[in-house]
Swiss-Prot record:
<feature type="binding site">
    <location>
        <position position="120"/>
    </location>
    <ligand>
        <name>5-amino-6-(D-ribitylamino)uracil</name>
    </ligand>
</feature>
<feature type="binding site">
    <location>
        <begin position="92"/>
        <end position="93"/>
    </location>
    <ligand>
        <name>(2S)-2-hydroxy-3-oxobutyl phosphate</name>
    </ligand>
</feature>
<keyword id="KW-0686">Riboflavin biosynthesis</keyword>
<comment type="similarity">
    <text>Belongs to the DMRL synthase family.</text>
</comment>
<dbReference type="InterPro" id="IPR034964">
    <property type="entry name" value="LS"/>
</dbReference>
<feature type="binding site">
    <location>
        <begin position="61"/>
        <end position="63"/>
    </location>
    <ligand>
        <name>5-amino-6-(D-ribitylamino)uracil</name>
    </ligand>
</feature>
<feature type="active site" description="Proton donor">
    <location>
        <position position="95"/>
    </location>
</feature>
<dbReference type="GO" id="GO:0000906">
    <property type="term" value="F:6,7-dimethyl-8-ribityllumazine synthase activity"/>
</dbReference>
<dbReference type="InterPro" id="IPR002180">
    <property type="entry name" value="LS/RS"/>
</dbReference>
<dbReference type="GO" id="GO:0005829">
    <property type="term" value="C:cytosol"/>
</dbReference>
<dbReference type="Pfam" id="PF00885">
    <property type="entry name" value="DMRL_synthase"/>
</dbReference>
<dbReference type="GO" id="GO:0009349">
    <property type="term" value="C:riboflavin synthase complex"/>
</dbReference>
<feature type="binding site">
    <location>
        <position position="30"/>
    </location>
    <ligand>
        <name>5-amino-6-(D-ribitylamino)uracil</name>
    </ligand>
</feature>
<comment type="pathway">
    <text>Cofactor biosynthesis; riboflavin biosynthesis; riboflavin from 2-hydroxy-3-oxobutyl phosphate and 5-amino-6-(D-ribitylamino)uracil: step 1/2.</text>
</comment>
<feature type="binding site">
    <location>
        <position position="134"/>
    </location>
    <ligand>
        <name>(2S)-2-hydroxy-3-oxobutyl phosphate</name>
    </ligand>
</feature>
<keyword id="KW-0808">Transferase</keyword>
<dbReference type="InterPro" id="IPR036467">
    <property type="entry name" value="LS/RS_sf"/>
</dbReference>
Length: 181
């Protein structure tokens, strides 16, 4: 089996330091031990990047997009990014597909519409063993990966904003040309 690129896990957190930016972690601790590992990884990554963060819990993965929408509507300027954490383990019914697909769809739609730096740390797995391996800070660190994704997008938005400002300044300067031919 091919090994995934671990670029996010190997990213130097100091390189993506975000000063006082504030992030919202929304967790669905349906599986408490898995959620605790995801949260530990996310909090560690945010702390290393010198970000501030708040954590809220909701019952399940389907409630995460709704909670994020409420937070953004009630306090639109409070958060510069968000991280979703949770776990969906396949059972014997179609419910797995509904929860996995609809939570991902709703989150993607929301963060794209709002242009919000975001990291999705909602695991979708076949077994609890898979979930524990992926959530563990020592092995998979998917909570940390989700936080690093949000941090990287935040830095991108800041840096791209500076590029745009520089381009606008350049566009306003008069163009000097050499003499007429």
């Amino acid at each position: 089996m091919a090994e995934p690129r671990r670029a996010l896990a190997q990213m130097d957190d100091a390189r993506i330091s975000v000063g006082n930016a504030r992030f919202l972690i929304i967790e669905a601790p349906y599986y408490e031990d898995i959620a605790a590992q995801l949260r530990a990884g996310a909090e560690a990554a945010l702390t290393r990047a010198q970000a501030r963060f708040d954590v809220v819990s909701v019952p399940g993965a389907l409630e995460i997009p709704i909670a994020l929408a409420i937070a953004l509507d009630r306090a639109p300027a409070l958060y510069q990014g968000a991280i979703a954490l949770g776990c969906i383990i396949r059972g014997e019914t179609y419910h797995f597909e509904i929860v996995a697909n609809e939570s991902a769809r709703a989150l993607t739609q929301l963060v794209v519409e709002r242009k919000l730096p975001f990291g999705n740390g909602i695991l979708t797995v076949e077994t609890e063993t898979q979930a524990l391996e992926r959530a563990s800070v020592e092995s998979g660190d998917k909570g940390g990966d989700a936080a690093r994704a949000a941090l990287a997008l935040y830095r991108f938005s800041q840096e791209f904003g500076q590029v745009v400002e520089q381009a606008q300044i350049q566009a306003q300067r008069p163009v000097l040309t050499s003499g007429a031919r």
